[in-house]
Every structure is written in C-alpha cells, then in structure tokens.
Amino acid sequence: MKAVVFAMVMAVSFNVFASGDESDKQALQSLLKQTQSLSAEFEQQVKDEQGEVLQTLSGTLKLKRPANLYWHTKEPDESVMVANGKKVWYYNPFVEQVTIYAQQDMVDDSPLLLVLNSNGNQWQNYNVSFRDNRYFVEHQTNGSKLELRFTDEKLTEITMVQAQGERTELMLNNVALNETISDEQFVFDVPADVDVDDQS
C-alpha cells in the first residue's frame, strides 16, 4: 500500500500551488508546468524515522497531464498501478487482486498527487518553500511533507515524509520529458481470474 500512496503522490505534483512563499511557489509552478509528460526508471526506498531501510523497490513510471499515471514495480514485489484521471487501478499479481480507487479520493489523501492535479484547490492546505536545492511542500495541519529536487529542470528526486517520520525516497533515472505517450498506456485491462475490490 505504501507504493500506492507514493505513486499517487507522484501523480499530483505537476500543478498549481496556492500557498507558501510567492516566489518559491512561482518557481516550482514554472518548473512543473514545463512538464507535459515524464517517463523514467526509478529506485525507491522506504525508511523508518531512524533511517533504517524497510523496503526497496525499482521499476518504471510514466506521467502525462492532466492526470495520468503508469507505475510498474519489478519482481520480487511486482505491482502495476494505472490512473486515468478518474480511477486508479492497483494490481498485485502475487495476491491476484486488482483494487480500484476513485482518483479524487487519492488526491485528497496524498500530497504527491498534487504533481498532476490541475485543480489548485488541494494546494490551499500546503505551504511551499525552497532551500538546500529542494522544494518543500508541507501540509499545514497533518505534518506530511513532500520534497522535490530538479536537475537541469528535470524532476530527479522525490521524498515523502510522513508525520511520524517515515520517509519514502524516489530517485528517477533516464528521465525523458515531454515525449509522446499514448493514452492507451493509461488504460488498464483487468486480467482474467483475479479478485476485484472496487472502492471507487
């Protein structure tokens, strides 16, 4: 489930920020607006509050405005997540189950989904600042934080910090910006003979 939350946080960060320092907000907004699509390989680590690694994942992701996400983690923890702006499908081949969520509900619960979301209303609950070559997006009440780092105007590192101190770090490699990605990439066909849990 941590992979689901983090991937959905990815699917929100392309858009408009409504709080925080105005110059930091505008700078981050400008960087994010330049990105209409993004494809990359990733390495993800989940760490506890002491920095101990709890989980390591790798895979590929694709993002496309306005709200499309494809996220595929490799074995041994293989999973696939597809979001099309309305629904999110999370497929775990090991347990042979597909869970379907309403994407708007995921946006409300996850700061990372702010990257793609074209509705700036969610940003009213976040502050944005820039220091140490990173943008920090912090929820005003629940303490969750999102850190975004860009290299040559490409998003290359994302860290999500939960209020209790757990960190999820995502390093992006072989980043390709604004290449054509077919809408078919964001269509999920439920495999035969799997359980479906529709929470949408």
Curated annotation (Swiss-Prot):
Gene Ontology cellular component annotations, sorted alphabetically: outer membrane-bounded periplasmic space
UniProt superkingdom: Bacteria
CDD domains associated with the record: LolA
Leader peptide range in chain numbering: 1-18
Subcellular compartments: Periplasm
Keyword set, alphabetical order: Chaperone, Periplasm, Protein transport, Signal, Transport
Keyword Signal: yes
Biological processes annotated in GO: lipoprotein localization to outer membrane; lipoprotein transport
UniProt xrefs under PANTHER family: OUTER-MEMBRANE LIPOPROTEIN CARRIER PROTEIN
Annotated family: Belongs to the LolA family.
Function (record text): Participates in the translocation of lipoproteins from the inner membrane to the outer membrane. Only forms a complex with a lipoprotein if the residue after the N-terminal Cys is not an aspartate (The Asp acts as a targeting signal to indicate that the lipoprotein should stay in the inner membrane).
UniProt-recorded name of the protein: Outer-membrane lipoprotein carrier protein
Biological source species: Idiomarina loihiensis (strain ATCC BAA-735 / DSM 15497 / L2-TR)
Gene coding for it: lolA
